[in-house]
Regions:
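Active-site catalytic-loop/activation-segment of kinase and kinase-like phosphoryl-transfer enzymes
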Residues: 2-55
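Short, catalytically relevant binding-site loops at active-site mouths
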Residues: 6, 72-74
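Active-site Asp-x-Gly
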Residues: 11-14, 18-23, 32, 61-67, ...
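Short, intrinsically disordered, low-complexity segments enriched in Ser/Thr and Pro
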Residues: 43-65, 160-164
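Short helix/strand-capping connector loops at secondary-structure junctions
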Residues: 134-143
Length: 166
């Protein structure tokens, strides 16, 4: 069901096509919101251009749906007093497991042993190193819409990087 990521509504209606879901309910939604909040020009134009290229990031890759935390950064993970790991403040939805893993890299704070253990259990598919930027763009656009500031320039750089990767 729908929820929020921070204070931003997050539409989670089931969709049979992961690329269309990411286009419509993640990047497209955040770009539209950014435009309605006065962010325009190159950011929106290049963002819309990027939306038209999404299939090129998924050639030969069809991720099975996984239950995602949705906002998995180091501030939403920790240890109980007994040492057991816990996660909190989720923005849960079903999607590509790479989206959660990508966010753990966005702001840092996870150990190399975390990534080594993850990759030993679930090896990453080719293209992850590029797709992670596509997944993290959603969070950077959300931060732009929530906080403004330098997130617009960061989003623009990410979009340009992704367009150059095609």
């Amino acid at each position: 069901r729908d929820n929020t990521i921070g204070a931003t509504p997050q539409v989670n209606t089931r969709h049979g096509d992961w690329i269309a879901f990411w286009h419509e309910r993640r990047l497209g939604y955040q770009l539209k919101l950014a435009g309605s909040r006065g962010h325009s020009g190159r950011l929106i134009a290049n963002g819309e251009r990027l939306l038209g290229t999404l299939p090129s990031f998924f050639h030969g890759y069809t991720p099975p749906p996984s239950l995602l935390h949705g906002d998995l950064w180091s501030g939403n993970a920790g240890l109980e007093s007994g040492g057991d790991p816990v996660i909190y403040d989720p923005a849960v939805y079903y999607g590509d497991r790479e989206a959660d893993l990508a966010m753990t890299e966005l702001f840092g704070g996870f150990s190399q042993s975390f990534y080594q253990a993850y990759r030993a259990e679930h090896p990453l598919d080719p293209g992850y190193e590029t797709r992670k930027h596509l997944y993290n763009l959603y969070h950077v656009l959300n931060h732009l819409n929530l906080f403004g500031g330098g997130y617009g320039a960061k989003a623009q750089r990410m979009i340009e990087h992704l367009l150059a990767a095609i």
